[in-house]
Structures are given as structure tokens and as C-alpha cells.
């Protein structure tokens, strides 16, 4: 499980580091849990003008419906397969529930085919029903997760579905409890208060090797729907504020093509209600 480095037979393979896909156990998705998805081409419907740069084409894909709520309380589910999902960096797991229903969830590290997972709702937990074990794949409200546990797939509002920590290799950590809230350290280093009725899944999102992947050639980017990103300094003055000049010239403050300041310029619009729940801000360097 992980990545493989190609032999430098061609220029496209020289620096390529790709997935080995050894963790996958099934090639075709569960058809009842997918639907056709038309890629966003980044152009207007009427005139075909670019509305969002660097997008276009890409392979045909079907969207996988992921269960981000984990609301089937106390119904055990068996891991049937580990599958690829073109819409996210993480792998997904197909669960077969005891009542016959099938659902996809994100693949936690160390969860294998044949394992059993279970979740419990806040309502059932406060009634005194037995809590699931603290092991990868099980889900429960933050109130009942021990301090120090690594978690992912975290809700911000009870019952609204997970919004945080869903990418490959990521995890957050419960570091405290206080008056109806859990203190959670996010991958960015930010410490935030989250309602302890919110659901979270135990464990770390699988495929931590994702950050090592290098596509190696432009063609693989096009397969993923990514078009070339041309530097502003390589354009003409009519096309970009950085354009023009003799040779490779700089000497201007970094700007977008429309004159907006970039690189260090704060783009957040005012304060948000949720800012009051931030105990300490994220690290400037990104992940902890």
C-alpha cells in the first residue's frame, strides 16, 4: 500500500511518483450509490468564455454518494470493499449494514475488509446504551470520545454532516472538554470549540502517502480536469498586471489579473459568528 516510483524510461516517467493502488479491493463502484456528474468546464453556457481559469476536459466520472452523517445508530456494518473515488484524495469504503442497506464512508487507516464498524447517535448515548469501542471506523458524538483520541470526519453542527478533516492522511485530536463543547486541534494547528453533540469518526483518514504523489507529466493533469496555469509575467500587459517588459521583469506588487492583491493579502470578509469558537489560530506554516 502506498506509492511507486517509475523508472526514468521517458521524460513523462522520470519524476513520476504514482499510487500503487494495492489497498483497493474492488474496481467497479456500487451503481446504486453513484450518479453521472458533468464536470465543471469553467466556461459560460451562453458564450463559452472562461469564467474559472485552469479547468477543462478530464475523464468521465461518476459521483459517489458518501455518508458524512453516520446516523444509522447501533446498526453494525461490515466492510465489504475499499474503493477509489475520483472526487477526493481519500479512498472510500463500502459498508453492508445488518439491515441490508449499503453506504460509502471515508476509509480510515487500519480498517480492513471484513471488519465491523458501528456508530451511535447522541440520543441513544445519553440513554445509557452501550458505546462502540474506540477503534478506527466507529463513530460517536464528541462528548463520548476520550481526550487524546485522533478523529476525522467531524461535524460543525449536529446532524448537518461532517465538514472537517476529510482529506487523505489527515486527523484531528480531542484535547479537552468544556461546558457542552469539545476542544479539537485541527490539522492546521487551529484549536476550536465544537459542540459535543457533533459526530466524529475514530481514527486517521487513510492514504497518508497522498502528499508524495507527483503526476510527472501534463497529460495526467488533463485527465484530472486541470488545464495549464500560465504565469502573469509570461503574458502581455493587456492580459495581466504583471505582463510586458523587456525580458524577465518584476518590480510590481503581486496582483491577480483583475488587480486584486495576492500573496499575504487577507481575503476574509469581516468577522464570522463562528470566530468566537476559535481558541488559538492556525499555524502560519500549515499542518502541525
From Swiss-Prot:
It holds the Pfam family Ribosomal_L2_C. Keywords: Ribonucleoprotein, Ribosomal protein, RNA-binding, rRNA-binding. GO terms for biological process: cytoplasmic translation. Residues 232-265 are annotated as: Disordered. One of its GO terms (molecular function) is rRNA binding. PROSITE patterns: RIBOSOMAL_L2. Residues 239-255 have a biased composition (Basic and acidic residues). Belongs to the universal ribosomal protein uL2 family. NCBIfam families: rplB_bact (TIGR01171). One of the primary rRNA binding proteins. Required for association of the 30S and 50S subunits to form the 70S ribosome, for tRNA binding and peptide bond formation. It has been suggested to have peptidyltransferase activity; this is somewhat controversial. Makes several contacts with the 16S rRNA in the 70S ribosome. Part of the 50S ribosomal subunit. Forms a bridge to the 30S subunit in the 70S ribosome. This is Large ribosomal subunit protein uL2. It comes from Hydrogenobaculum sp. (strain Y04AAS1). The gene is rplB.
Amino acid at each position: 500500500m502506498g506509492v511507486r516510483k517509475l523508472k526514468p524510461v521517458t521524460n513523462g516517467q522520470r519524476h513520476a511518483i504514482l499510487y500503487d493502488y494495492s489497498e483497493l479491493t474492488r474496481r467497479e463502484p456500487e451503481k446504486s450509490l453513484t450518479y453521472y456528474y458533468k464536470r465543471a468546464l469553467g466556461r459560460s453556457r451562453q458564450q463559452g468564455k472562461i469564467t474559472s481559469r485552469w479547468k477543462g476536459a478530464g475523464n468521465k466520472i461518476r459521483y459517489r454518494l458518501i455518508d458524512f452523517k453516520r446516523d444509522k445508530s447501533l446498526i453494525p456494518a461490515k466492510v465489504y470493499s475499499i474503493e477509489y473515488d475520483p472526487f477526493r484524495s481519500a479512498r472510500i469504503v463500502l459498508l453492508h449494514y445488518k439491515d441490508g442497506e449499503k453506504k460509502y464512508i471515508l476509509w480510515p487507516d487500519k480498517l480492513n475488509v471484513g471488519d465491523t464498524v458501528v456508530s451511535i447517535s447522541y440520543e441513544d448515548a445519553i440513554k445509557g446504551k452501550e458505546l462502540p469501542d474506540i477503534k478506527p471506523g466507529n463513530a460517536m458524538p464528541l462528548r463520548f470520545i476520550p481526550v487524546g483520541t485522533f478523529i476525522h470526519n467531524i461535524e460543525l453542527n449536529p446532524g448537518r454532516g461532517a465538514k472537517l478533516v476529510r482529506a487523505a492522511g489527515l486527523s484531528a485530536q480531542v484535547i479537552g472538554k468544556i461546558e457542552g463543547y469539545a476542544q479539537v486541534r485541527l490539522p492546521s494547528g487551529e484549536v476550536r470549540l465544537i459542540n459535543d453533540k457533533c459526530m466524529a469518526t475514530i481514527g486517521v483518514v487513510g492514504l497518508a502517502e497522498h502528499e508524495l504523489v507527483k503526476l510527472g507529466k501534463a497529460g495526467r493533469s488533463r485527465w484530472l480536469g486541470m488545464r495549464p496555469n500560465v504565469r502573469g509575467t509570461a503574458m502581455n500587459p493587456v492580459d495581466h498586471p504583471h505582463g510586458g517588459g523587456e525580458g524577465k521583469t518584476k518590480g510590481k506588487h503581486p496582483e491577480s489579473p483583475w488587480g486584486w492583491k495576492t500573496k499575504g493579502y487577507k481575503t476574509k470578509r469581516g468577522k464570522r459568528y463562528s470566530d468566537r469558537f476559535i481558541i488559538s489560530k492556525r499555524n502560519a506554516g500549515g499542518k502541525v
